[in-house]
Amino acid sequence: METGYEEAVATVAVFADGSVSLYISSGGGIIGAGEHPMVREAAERLLTITEKYVPEFESGSQTPLPQTGRVRFYIRTFTATLTADADEQDLGQHRHKLSAVFHAGQGVITEMRLASEKPKGGIQ
């Protein structure tokens, strides 16, 4: 799931093997977040929800970055790349058929943020 902002594009990458990362096009991000149980659970939810919406995606070989205010979804399979694009506000306000996928992706980002805020070595 890629979201276009004026200053950068944020990419949340979730894989079936449990790998979860966040990449920021202007630099930085979070790699290996799937090691955190809550992040992994949110990622599994995203994959499960996305699977239900596969018919809403189109086959495509191009992977352009989303424009500001747009969200681009990708599904990579062994045989194809599927894509869909929508307005972030429409997704956020449940006005788009892929809103559930968007909100599940936001759940992954929330869990990544919470996991990165936990103190290291202390009581958690």
Task: Label the model's feature ranges.
Residues 70-124:
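Short, well-ordered, aromatic-rich surface patches in folded extracellular/luminal domains
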Residues 16-18, 38, 87-92:
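A short, sequence-level motif marking secondary-structure junctions
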Residues 27-55:
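Long, charged/polar, surface-exposed segments that mediate recognition or autoinhibition
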Residues 1-31, 66-80, 119-124:
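N-terminal domain-start interaction segment
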Residues 57-65:
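Surface-exposed patches in mature extracellular/periplasmic domains of secreted proteins
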